[in-house]
Amino acid sequence: RHTFIYSSLGKSCHLSYQSYTLPCNCNHKRIGLYYLLSTFLFGLSGTILSVLIRLELCSSGNRIIPPENQNFYNLSITLHGLLMIFFLVMPGLFGGLGNTFVPIYLGAPEVAYPRVNNMSVLVIPLSYTLVLLSLNSEFGSGTGWTLYPPLSTSLMSLSPVGVDVIICG
């Protein structure tokens, strides 16, 4: 969106471009804000999974998750672990706070390698999409906390495609 800033004489003296879309600039404060906003959204989905896991554990006779879908509990533990570690804690602390507050504390005008920060901000939603696509594979990738490639070729009730997609994400 283009905005003109007018001087007191009515002449346009400056043309500025304001972008409210994906981060297409290398301003470290804006990139840090995108990190913090994305970690907030991923944290909400991780919190929903945490509440679902706790409700399942506290109800002894009544089950929240239907008994026909036994792998969904393991799948929710896998997704909860990935979301909380790799989509909430690491991008929030390293990307969000590291890009927003650390340069301000140090008095640095810019950060080193801002284009790499920009690229990693754009890769996070793609990675989240791959993690969600692993849900739609055959049985899902309900491996719990153990995510490693031999599980993708095992004869267990896991989806080999789902494990590969969640490792790639």
Language-model regions: role of each:
Residues 1-169:
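...captures the hydrophobic TM-helix bundle architecture rather than a specific catalytic motif
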